Amino acid sequence: MIFSRKQLKHLRRDAKNALLFGWHAPRAAERIFIAPSAVVTYAQRSPSRSDTGRVLSGNWDLQVKPLDEHPKVRYCINRFVRGQSWEEAGAIEHAKKLLDKRGSADGRRSWAEISRRLEEIDKLYSELKETRRLKTSAEFLNQASSREDSGVYIHIDRFGRPIFGGKGCHRFAICKILDIPVIPAQLGLVHEQAASSKKALRKLRHDTRE
């Protein structure tokens, strides 16, 4: 079997964590299941999926902001709760700032691409409103995999509480707005205190979606 560079990185992190924390250790790109209602903050740390399953000590988990201050969450609330247009909601202004700063917004480099992206988000809202079930990455890609690459990104703080990690913003915001009980997510950073606890991740590893 030939592994990709990403797979090898995941396996190395899994092995390191297992040596340090035992069989219950966090795993890279691990699929967890969280209640969107339990997530009330987002990390100030710049989001990076390369941190997935990484165990980190220190006070990074205290450097958070209220979730409703996240720009993408805020404009999704304006769009889907208050019924505003994307422009009124602030999505266009946010995209313009990203284009000016980085040359792209969510990987889109033109206004035509951004417009199509916003249409896709509208469709996702309609779909999730009807099904009330967010697919795992494996379900979406029709693959047999226990990893949750590209999922809603969730860090775990020292007390085992979820922190939004800044990836999968629109999916996560819509699920929270619709009050969907449980969704799949990709494990991000895990505080060392939580990694040392057998209970911290155990309850997040069971798929309780209906």
Task: State each model region's role.
Residues 8, 16, 73, 91-92, ...:
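Short amphipathic alpha-helical segments that mediate assembly, nucleic-acid/protein binding
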Residues 11-26, 47-65, 72, 148-202:
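A short, basic-hydrophobic beta/loop patch
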Residues 26, 88, 94-164:
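Short alpha-helix boundary/capping and kink motifs at helix termini
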Residues 4, 8, 66, 88, ...:
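Intrinsic-disorder-associated interaction segments
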